[in-house]
Swiss-Prot record:
Identification of the protein by name: Pyruvate dehydrogenase E1 component subunit alpha, mitochondrial
Protein task: The pyruvate dehydrogenase complex catalyzes the overall conversion of pyruvate to acetyl-CoA and CO(2).
PTM summary: Phosphorylated at Ser-313 by pyruvate dehydrogenase kinases PKP1 (PDK1) and PKP2 (PDK2), and dephosphorylated by pyruvate dehydrogenase phosphatases PTC5 and PTC6.
Transit peptide: 1-33
């Protein structure tokens, strides 16, 4: 029964919230304790029996470029904070399971984990609706879960099983869900696609925007700047989100970028930098960014300052280009899950014992999902499967060409069209 409470529910539009919250946060070398107070005012979307809280963010939470930063005060429900905590714990347990499965050689190939960066996926999802689009780089497992995929479907895909979100054909870098367009294995290639998603929203007069995520390592790609230009030229509702985790593979940002204030890279596009280790600040900044785009102001560059605890990928120990002391300092002083846990206890949303029970239930739930994913069969070893899953089901063409014309597949015949 406990496991059922961790099933990801579709996000709903949060209305009537002001701006940001205050939490223990650290930007650069500044660490500040937030102040919070309960309020009697209830938002209409609050679930029955829950109270709202007023959250005050430290002044160091944001740094802006060509715009006024978000408010440092906003109101949200206790239920929302609790759900965000549960989601971050699930994502971390899922990533830890990926680590173990990779080491057990059940996951092969590329695998990029986001342990330490959970606040970004969870904070964004709580600030938007299912009408909005998200597209990311290859570090995408948490986003896939937050967009509605099950832990089982994510892990099954990583293990090459038919129950995976891409039917076992995509692997770690090619995960998809409704409103989530991947996962992209080419550095920076998702950015122009994200601009295209924003154009589609604009063309169809949809009340939605595109959150297009890329890393500091991709920020110097030419196609990123080309996308900036097109987005500003056409006033597209796109939020260019730079996940600055300080290292592009094993190269520190300062060694690869002449200017590391990525939120200012848009030049003619306003920008905002936010403490990406603080989910409450991430939520407020993301909501601000969406409101900015939908108000007709055009694109926005949003930089999330974050940190990955592990290496670039499973083949990288992550300790040859940074010290263990640096990693431990970030874990002990800036962990997004530990920070939100403190708020849950301080606000009386949950006791220490209840939080431990949530953690235990999350561990049990993910373990069960691992077993289900591991038990799922791989794609059937038949020739026709190479030509399946190209088109949306129900829209398939009668034939599909392969590498050469002679390799054209006939779906009705279930064989090559030009062969007996």
């Amino acid at each position: 029964m406990l496991a059922a409470s961790f099933k990801r529910q579709p996000s709903q539009l949060v209305r009537g919230l002001g701006a940001v919250l205050r939490t223990p946060t650290r930007i650069g070398h500044v660490r500040t304790m937030a102040t919070l107070k309960t309020t009697d005012k209830k938002a209409p979307e609050d679930i029955e029996g829950s109270d709202t809280v007023q959250i005050e963010l430290p002044e160091s939470s944001f740094e802006s470029y060509m715009l006024e930063p978000p408010d440092l005060s906003y109101e949200t429900s206790k239920a929302t904070l609790l759900q965000m905590y549960k989601d971050m714990v699930i994502i971390r347990r899922m990533e830890m399971a990926c680590d173990a499965l990779y080491k057990a050689k059940k996951i092969r190939g590329f695998c990029h984990l986001s342990v330490g960066q959970e606040a970004i996926a969870v904070g964004i999802e709580n600030a938007i609706t299912k009408l909005d689009s998200i597209i990311t780089s290859y570090r995408c497992h948490g986003f896939t879960f937050m967009r509605g995929a099950s832990v089982k479907a994510v892990l099954a895909e990583l293990m090459g099983r038919r129950a995976g979100v891409s039917y076992g054909k995509g692997g770690s870098m090619h995960l998809y869900a409704p409103g989530f367009y991947g996962g992209n294995g080419i550095v920076g290639a998702q950015v122009p696609l994200g601009a295209g998603l924003a154009f589609a929203h604009q063309y169809k007069n949809e009340d939605a925007c595109s959150f297009t995520l890329y890393g500091d390592g991709a920020s110097n790609q030419g196609q990123v700047f080309e996308s900036f230009n097109m987005a500003k030229l056409w006033n597209l509702p796109v939020v260019f989100c730079c996940e600055n985790n300080k290292y592009g593979m094993g190269t520190a940002a300062s060694r690869s970028s002449a200017m590391t204030e990525y939120f200012k890279r848009g030049q003619y596009i306003p920008g905002l930098k936010v403490n990406g280790m603080d989910i409450l600040a991430v939520y407020q900044a993301s909501k601000f960014a969406k409101d900015w785009c939908l108000s007709g102001k055009g694109p926005l560059v949003l930089e999330y300052e974050t940190y990955r605890y592990g290496g670039h990928s499973m083949s990288d120990p992550g300790t040859t280009y940074r010290t263990r002391d640096e990693i431990q300092h970030m874990r002990s002083k800036n962990d997004p899950i530990a920070g939100l846990k403190m708020h849950l206890i301080d606000l009386g949303i949950a006791t220490e014992a209840e939080v431990k029970a949530y953690d235990k239930s999350a561990r049990k739930y993910v373990d069960e999902q691992v077993e289900l994913a591991d038990a799922a069969p791989p794609p059937e070893a038949k020739l026709s499967i190479l030509f399946e899953d190209v088109y949306v089901k129900g829209t398939e063409t009668p034939t599909l060409r392969g590498r050469i014309p002679e390799d054209t597949w006939d779906f009705k015949k279930q064989g090559f069209a030009s062969r007996d």
